[in-house]
């Protein structure tokens, strides 16, 4: 799995109570995405909206924890959603 997608999957594990999150995680497990661009292209509007919301929080959390590597990797996906 792409490193960036690995960070994303780990972040999503904090939100598995949400149905959209569960759907995204199932996609990640069912398909082997070569990179984050390929993954984002496969998302529907609801999934993109959910990720946009979650990634804002997860990136801020990573920055507050001074985990710049994590913040950078998550930001790569976030930028593709915009």
UniProtKB/Swiss-Prot annotation:
Keywords annotated in UniProt: Sporulation
Upregulation: Expression is regulated by the sporulation transcription factor sigma G.
One BP term from GO: sporulation resulting in formation of a cellular spore
InterPro entries in UniProt: CsgA (IPR020255)
Protein name, as recorded: Sigma-G-dependent sporulation-specific SASP protein
Lineage, broadest ranks: Bacteria, Bacillati, Bacillota, Bacilli, Bacillales
Organism: Bacillus subtilis (strain 168)
Matches recorded under Pfam families: CsgA
């Amino acid at each position: 799995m792409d490193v960036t997608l690995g960070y994303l999957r780990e972040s999503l594990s904090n939100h598995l109570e949400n149905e959209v999150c569960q759907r995204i995680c199932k996609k990640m497990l069912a398909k082997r995405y070569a990179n984050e661009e390929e993954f984002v292209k496969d998302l529907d509007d609801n999934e993109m909206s959910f990720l946009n919301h979650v990634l804002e929080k997860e990136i801020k959390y990573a920055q507050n924890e001074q985990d710049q590597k994590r913040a950078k990797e998550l930001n790569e996906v976030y930028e593709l959603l915009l």
